[in-house]
Amino acid sequence: MYSHVRDLLFRLNPETSHEFSLDMLGAAERLKLIGLMAAKVPETPVEVMGLRFPNPVGLAAGLDKNGDYFNALGALGFGFVEIGTITPRPQPGNAQPRLFRIPEAKAIINRMGFNNKGVDHLVAQVKKRRYQGILGINIGKNATTPVENAVDDYLTCLRKVYDHADYITVNISSPNTPGLRSLQFGDSLSQLLAPLKKEQGVLQQAGGRYVPIAVKIAPDMDDSEIAQVAGVLLQEGMDGVIATNTTIGREGVEGYDTGKEAGGLSGLPVRDKSTAVIQSLNQCLGGKLPIIGVGGIFDGASAADKVRAGASLVQVYSGFIYEGPALIAAAAAGIASYHQGQ
C-alpha cells in the first residue's frame, strides 16, 4: 500500500512531496484516521536516560522541524519522536533546490540549512500537544550567529524548550550550517557543553524536573576524534549521544548525477559508516553513556546491527521515507529478535 503512495509522491518535487505528506498526515490525525496508517508495534519498553520508551524505534529530527506534525507522527507507532532542529530566530534556510532523492541508492541528500519558524513557534505548538509519548527537541544555532557565539543560541533554545521536552538534543553535526561541525572538536566542545550542563542544573532546580541532554554527532570522524568527543561527553556530564547525522562523503552515490549535489547524505549509503562510529563510540564510552543509533536503517536486520554495535535506541528518517510506517514494526521486531538471541 505505502509503496504505491510513495511512487506517486516521488513524482513531486522532494520538498513539495515532504510538505504534502505531512499535511495529509496531520489531516488524518485530526480526522482520527491515523490509526489506519499506524504500524502494529508490540510494546517492548526500554529505559534510557531515565525515561521509559515504549519501544526502541524513534523518529529522527528533521522531518518535523517546527513541531507542526508530531501529534500525527507520534500516532504511527514510534517509541519516541524528535522534532527540530530549531533555532532562536526563524530563518529560511538555504536556497532551493536543497533536497534530493536518489531512489536507486535509497539515499537522500539535503542542504536545508536549519530552515525553521523559530523556537517560540515550536514551543507554542508543543504546549498544545496531544501526543503522550516521549518527545525530544533538537536545538541548533542560527546561520547568522558567529560560531564563537554559538553557545548563546543553544542556551536560548535550552531555556525555552526545557519545560516542554522529555529530552533535548544539541545538534552540532549538520554539515549545512557553516562552521557548525567545528564545535565537535578540541576545546570548542567543552566550551559549548559546560555552560549547557550548568544551565540544565539551574532549570532543574527552578522547575523540579530533570530533562536529559543528548549530543548529536557526525559520522565523518576517525577513531581518535571519536575518542576525544567521547571523553568530553563524559567529562561534561551529558546524558546521551546520537550517532550519527548525515555524511559529507559520497560513497554509494558516486555514479549518480544527483550524488554530486552539496549537502548531507543520508539513507542506505551511510549505514555502515554510522554503525562503525557507534561501535567505536561504544568502546570509548564503556557503557557509561547511552547511544541512540541512526543512519541507514531500512529493516529489522539493520536496526539490530545498530544495537549490536552498542546503541540502546535507534532512530529512522530516510528509511521511513522509503519504507513507510511498516519500518517501525520491522525495526522493533529486529531489535527484539536480537535481544532474545543473546
From Swiss-Prot:
Q: Which cofactor does it need?
A: FMN
Which residues are listed for substrate binding in this entry? 65, 110-114, 171, 176, 245-246
Q: Which reaction does it catalyse?
A: (S)-dihydroorotate + a quinone = orotate + a quinol
Q: Where in the sequence is the active site? A: 174 (nucleophile)
Top-level enzyme category: oxidoreductase
What keywords are annotated for this sequence in UniProt?
A: Cell membrane, Flavoprotein, FMN, Membrane, Oxidoreductase, Pyrimidine biosynthesis
**What are its GO cellular component terms?**
cytoplasm; plasma membrane
- Entry annotated with the keyword Transmembrane helix: no
Q: Name one GO biological process term.
A: 'de novo' UMP biosynthetic process
Q: Which residues bind FMN?
A: 61-65, 85, 138, 171, 216, 244, 267, 296, 317-318
Free-text comment on the cofactor: Binds 1 FMN per subunit.
Q: Does the keyword rRNA-binding apply?
A: no
The record's listing under InterPro entries reads: Aldolase_TIM (IPR013785), DHO_dehydrogenase (IPR050074), Dihydroorotate_DH_1_2 (IPR012135), Dihydroorotate_DH_2 (IPR005719), Dihydroorotate_DH_cat (IPR005720), Dihydroorotate_DH_CS (IPR001295)
Subcellular location(s) per record: Cell membrane
Entry EC no(s): 1.3.5.2
Q: What Pfam families does UniProt report for this protein, alphabetically? A: DHO_dh (PF01180)
> Pathway it acts in?
Pyrimidine metabolism; UMP biosynthesis via de novo pathway; orotate from (S)-dihydroorotate (quinone route): step 1/1
Q: How does it sit in the membrane?
A: Peripheral membrane protein
**Could you cite one Gene Ontology molecular function of this protein?**
dihydroorotate dehydrogenase (quinone) activity
Function field: Catalyzes the conversion of dihydroorotate to orotate with quinone as electron acceptor.
* Family membership: Belongs to the dihydroorotate dehydrogenase family. Type 2 subfamily.
Quaternary structure and partners: Monomer.
Family matches, as PANTHER family: DIHYDROOROTATE DEHYDROGENASE (QUINONE), MITOCHONDRIAL, DIHYDROOROTATE DEHYDROGENASE (QUINONE), MITOCHONDRIAL-RELATED
Its protein name is: Dihydroorotate dehydrogenase (quinone)
